[in-house]
Design a protein with these regions (language model features):
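Outer-membrane beta-barrel channel domains
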Residues: 1-226, 235, 279-350
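A generic structural signal for short coil/turn motifs at secondary-structure boundaries
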Residues: 87-89, 239-242, 266-267
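Compositionally biased low-complexity segments at domain edges in trafficked proteins
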Residues: 223-255
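Short catalytic-loop micro-motif centered on adjacent basic/acidic residues
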Residues: 264-269, 293-295
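Feature captures the catalytic cores and cofactor-binding loops of soluble hydro-lyases/lyases
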Residues: 275-277
């Protein structure tokens, strides 16, 4: 065995030669969490229903809401209807509330939606209802998949060792490792902020400790991971009164990417013949103290250009959370999905 980084030591008492090999001579080990794709569902169906009845001296009301669905493998089709015994003027007695077909691609964490659904929300734009097509990532339905900024514990060991992760003095993760370079995924159960400490202890009792501030939040994507949604269709208005009120055609692209452990950047762009919006999104973990979420937007409504900005500062303490939010809109700013005569509040603070 030869090499500039290999050390030899003669032990006369034991009549042995001790050989010290660096971790690079051992096989690298990646201790990833086991992720199992959901099993295909057998053919089946479901029925959800809700009834409301009221009676007074002047009127009697009976309303019923029902959702009927069928599913198989990774797809599902559902339809919801509303019945009013005594509809008001302009309302239908039988109303189709929504019809939606969903197809999952579990190995890619993707979902296709065709039918009535809602748009992706951001801190400046409210969601709106539409009928059309949506295709994008679907992380939240998979509890075994860590999509946020969990710390990946990476390093090397020349002896069998144990790696411990402490946050605010509490041991949250423990893993035994073999000699060599290692990479550990700490799992999906941690969502905290504070002082993190990684302790590596080998079988001889030698310890190495690394400390650093950390803010873990589901709003911060894992480094290199993309979150996106592409949608197009027609805006839906008065869905609780008319089941066919589809109007302006639109297209929308929503995209976010984890560029660093504490930084996620993205944009949200929508286009229609009357209104176009573009917003830039920035989510930042401020050391171990708080989460800063900002958005900057511009709109074009029939040639009138408007601007908007929002900023929120929040902190999760485990059992409770604290947050501040402020928004500012110019008079010309218009959102897709709003009626022409709807106006934004110039400034709001929460």
């Amino acid at each position: 065995i030869r090499g500039p980084d290999i050390k030899f030591q003669k032990d006369d008492a034991l009549q042995a030669i001790k050989i010290d090999l660096p971790a690079s001579y051992f096989k690298d080990t990646n201790y990833e969490n086991l992720i199992i794709n959901p099993r295909k569902a057998n053919f089946g169906g479901f029925l959800n229903y809700d009834y409301f009845y009221s009676k007074d001296d002047y009127s009697t009301d009976l309303n019923a809401y029902s959702e009927i669905g069928i599913f198989k493998d990774y797809w599902m089709l559902n339809n919801s209807v509303l019945y009013r015994d005594s509809p008001d003027e302009g309302e239908k007695q039988f109303l189709r509330v929504s019809s939606l077909f969903e197809l999952e691609f579990p190995d890619k964490y993707l979902k296709l939606r065709v039918g009535d659904t809602t748009s992706v929300y951001n801190s400046l734009f409210n969601s709106f209802r539409y009928g059309g097509i949506s295709f994008g990532t679907n992380y939240t339905d998979r509890p075994d998949f860590v999509y946020w900024n969990m710390p990946a514990l990476q390093g090397s060991a020349t002896l069998p060792s144990t790696v411990d992760l402490y946050i605010n003095g509490v041991n949250l993760y423990k893993q035994s490792i073999t000699p060599g370079n290692y990479s550990l995924q700490t799992g999906a159960t941690i969502d905290q902020a504070g002082d993190a400490k990684i302790v590596v202890e080998d079988i001889l009792g030698n310890q190495t400790v690394r400390s650093f501030p950390i803010y873990i939040s589901s709003q911060l994507l894992r480094v290199g991971l993309n979150e996106y949604d592409f949608s197009l269709g027609k805006l839906r208005y008065n869905y609780d009164e008319d089941d066919s009120d589809y109007r302006d055609f639109f297209s929308k692209v929503y995209f976010r990417r984890g560029v660093a452990t504490s930084t996620t950047l993205g944009f949200d762009a929508t286009y229609s013949e009357k209104v176009s919006n573009l917003s830039l999104l920035w989510t930042q973990g401020v050391s171990k103290f708080a989460l800063l979420d900002t958005a900057y937007a511009v709109s074009d409504f029939n040639g009138d250009v408007g601007y908007a900005i929002s900023a929120s500062l929040s902190r999760n303490f485990g059992n409770w959370s604290f947050g501040l939010n402020t928004r500012y809109y110019t008079e010309e700013f218009q959102q897709l999905g709003f009626d022409e005569y709807d106006f934004n509040t110039k400034m709001s603070n929460l």
